[in-house]
Amino acid sequence: MAIPPDIKDSIAKIKPLSQSAVRLMSVMADPDHTVGQIAAIVESDPILTGNVLRVVNSPAFGLRAKISTVSRAVSYTGGNMVVGLALHLCASGIFNHPLEGYESQRGALWRHCLLTAIASREIARFSSGKTDPEVAYTGGLLHDVGKAIMSGSLGNSAREIVAAADAEKTTDFVAGELAAVGTDHTEVGQAIAKHWSLPDPLLEVIRYHHAPSKAHEKYRPLVYAVHLGDFIAMMGGTGTGADTLLYNLDHDYKKFINVSAGELEKVILDSGQEYQQVVESMFGSEEEQQ
């Protein structure tokens, strides 16, 4: 596939991620990272510092005493939420933009990616390979970033793709995107990730989360974790519009994810509960995002 020139131009115009966000993702990719490393990055960014303190002191955390230091705040929020805050601050224009080409509203992409991130992290704990749950979380946050650009190129094609899928004339929404535009949101997403100089594990997740068997063998367990996390999020009611559940579940995930039916059910339940808590702590209520 070759990305059409107009989409390449749109990608080139995307603002770089903040240094804080890039450094946080790099640190989180190291399984031996410390709270101190995360706190040091947050402290170098006044806006991120303010948001981390706002979140940890929100009613959702229910702490009796106010937290006034970043190190203590990070020990409560955890690194995943800090990464989420950093991405939301520097790329909110992408994650909160209405995906009109997918017939979804403002904030739908962020909500879907957030629940995918939480579910992917939990699924990664059952991985048969050396899959870092923290990297799975970040991959989940970013897996559908390509839709922000693809949306404008789809036009009115979404309904045609849905109709074709219903009539079994196309295999899934990715194939429909390719037929309509000449590329798909996974390829566009990977191009955005390269534009942001993101590390290889995240490039693989973004490119192959709908085709995990095609991922590099080294990253395949990670990609399968996000693949399954994506489906959990869609089943949990946080899809991104017309394409929701119009993708194929690769049942080979069982070769990489050793999770029982009961454990999977618990992941789904726990992920949904954590999602609601994160939304409340970050935004006050889900409606405030919309």
Set out the residue ranges of the language-model regions.
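Terminal helices and disordered tails flanking the catalytic cores of nucleotide-processing hydrolases
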Residues: 1-6, 251-290
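Conserved alpha-helical "signature site"
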Residues: 1-247, 285-290
